[in-house]
């Protein structure tokens, strides 16, 4: 515990960030170790994971500390803005967290694919390993469908009518629009711990437009509607899980409150049905909190004998997904090496020499 960092600390409590990361208890580090030592894991993937853990991955933020002539700002974002004729002012830092988030437009597709890969594995495992007595219907596997479409195509409309839910949600959204605009305007892309694929989507987008929960589940026995969300987020800091859970709670606040209000209006004080948000959080470098993960699986009535195997699979998926995102970064960076270089041939030669870090 002595090495644990405080929430607002800008440096580790003792020794190094790597020591703090590796010594965190209850974060599935045994599976990180087995993945790193496995012969099935490519040596390049092991090297890149080690660089992330030791804070020595050769992104521009790290390179700038060694070679000040290299700008710490994201080159991929600069190229994207230049191609669109947009201003190149206030470019975000090219940190590991940034290039693994949808905040980097060039990496957005790769990041979304990484999120979907991990969630599809986890959802399939939950569906396949339920208790014999479980009566749980999962809806929302097709991410292309909006919430209204899912409502019309599933049995959930037997419990909650979409028009009634929409009316209540509209009222809640109207009340929250002002505070939501303030929250969005205060977002700082330079804060590494704020980088995430959701970027705090507005309530309206979550409920009525393209953004929606990763999945939903109806428990017919216990009369609960579960809103299921998966967050793949940077786990450099020890508070990664609480921050991701807070973002998920904010993101789905209107939906959960709307469902609860519909139930209260329909059933009065003796509420028969309830709604609950379950947020699974996976760190980009394989962090999965054991207690919280098991708690969620128990809530979804997964066979206890499968908890460890499912968690191991998720850790491996997270690590493989991270490597694919990092390889995407290298492919885009190196594919344009030398193009539009603002600092001349010297910088190109330097970047070429630094390729050994990859």
Show the residue positions of the predicted features.
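Active-site metal-binding core of divalent-cation-utilizing nuclease and nuclease-like domains
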Residues: 64, 68, 73, 134-230, ...
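Conserved pre-catalytic core of RNA-dependent polymerases
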Residues: 96-112, 117-121, 125
